[in-house]
Swiss-Prot record:
Protein name as it appears in the record: Ornithine decarboxylase antizyme 1
PROSITE patterns: ODC_AZ
InterPro entries per record: Acyl_CoA_acyltransferase, ODC_AZ, ODC_AZ_sf
Alphabetized Pfam families for the sequence: ODC_AZ (PF02100)
PANTHER family: ORNITHINE DECARBOXYLASE ANTIZYME, ORNITHINE DECARBOXYLASE ANTIZYME 1
GO BP annotations listed: polyamine biosynthetic process; positive regulation of intracellular protein transport; positive regulation of protein catabolic process; viral translational frameshifting
GO molecular function: ornithine decarboxylase inhibitor activity
Gene: oaz1
Family recorded in the similarity comment: Belongs to the ODC antizyme family.
Described function: Ornithine decarboxylase (ODC) antizyme protein that negatively regulates ODC activity and intracellular polyamine biosynthesis and uptake in response to increased intracellular polyamine levels. Binds to ODC monomers, inhibiting the assembly of the functional ODC homodimer, and targets the monomers for ubiquitin-independent proteolytic destruction by the 26S proteasome.
SUPFAM superfamilies xrefs: Acyl-CoA N-acyltransferases (Nat)
Keywords: Polyamine biosynthesis
Assembly information from the UniProt record: Interacts with ODC1 and thereby sterically blocks ODC homodimerization.
């Protein structure tokens, strides 16, 4: 369960708007779309241990996936080939159609109680959800939106892990590392088969611990 982590997110300073934002680098994608032949089910026991895992982010060239992250307003990337994936009073999620039936590109828009809307893009692959923390100043409402998305990942998607990624050259990199470690995320060492080979990016993972009764 992530209830305690959700409360920590709401109390954290990681998502607070800063006076001086970082330079945006949205043109550089951090994740790639895998081919269906490379995806396979495998265990993931510890972020610091290079165990077996799906080579869905191998060196084989894939079309780049741009994940700009939350924008803090109602602007969204409209895709003519997007289908409704999920919708409730807090989330509206559309899926971009791809040739890979094991990988889903999700456009997430969360509606907050104060009327704000925050948008994210994510990749759902092999029961793992990948979210990029956007460069620059995070929009107002980001922490609440992230908490909603994390809760949805656990209760609705029932994923095994949630990965976040951000560029290593961020000015607030140290603060992000401290905050997400406090929330229960672990640093994923470079070269792990569950994350893309991107030396310019930092990946962290949250593993959901489920009771045996939840799996019945």
């Amino acid at each position: 369960m992530v209830k305690s982590s959700l409360q920590r997110i709401l109390n954290s300073h990681c998502f607070a708007r800063e006076k001086e934002g970082n330079k945006r680098n949205d043109a550089m994608p951090l994740l790639s779309i895998p081919s269906s032949s490379e995806s396979s089910r495998a265990s993931f026991n510890c972020c610091s241990n290079l165990g077996p895992g799906p080579r869905w982010c191998s060196d084989v060239p894939h079309p780049p996936l741009k994940i700009p992250g939350g924008r803090g307003n109602s602007q969204r990337d409209h895709n003519l080939s997007a289908n409704l994936f999920y919708s409730d009073n807090r989330l509206n999620i559309t899926e971009e159609l791809t040739s890979n039936n094991r990988t889903r590109i999700l456009n997430v828009q969360s509606s907050l109680t104060d009327g704000k809307q925050v948008s994210w893009r994510a990749v759902l692959n092999n029961n793992n959800l990948y979210i990029e923390i956007p460069s620059g100043t995070l929009p107002d409402g980001s922490k609440d939106s992230f908490a909603i998305l994390l809760e949805y990942a656990e209760e609705q998607l029932q994923v095994d892990h949630v990965f976040i990624c951000f560029h290593k050259n961020r000015d607030d990199r140290a603060m992000l590392l401290r905050t997400f470690r406090f929330l229960g995320f672990e640093i994923v060492i470079p070269g792990h088969p569950l994350v893309p080979k991107r030396p310019d990016a930092c990946f962290m993972a949250y593993t959901f611990e489920r009771d045996s009764s939840d799996e019945d």
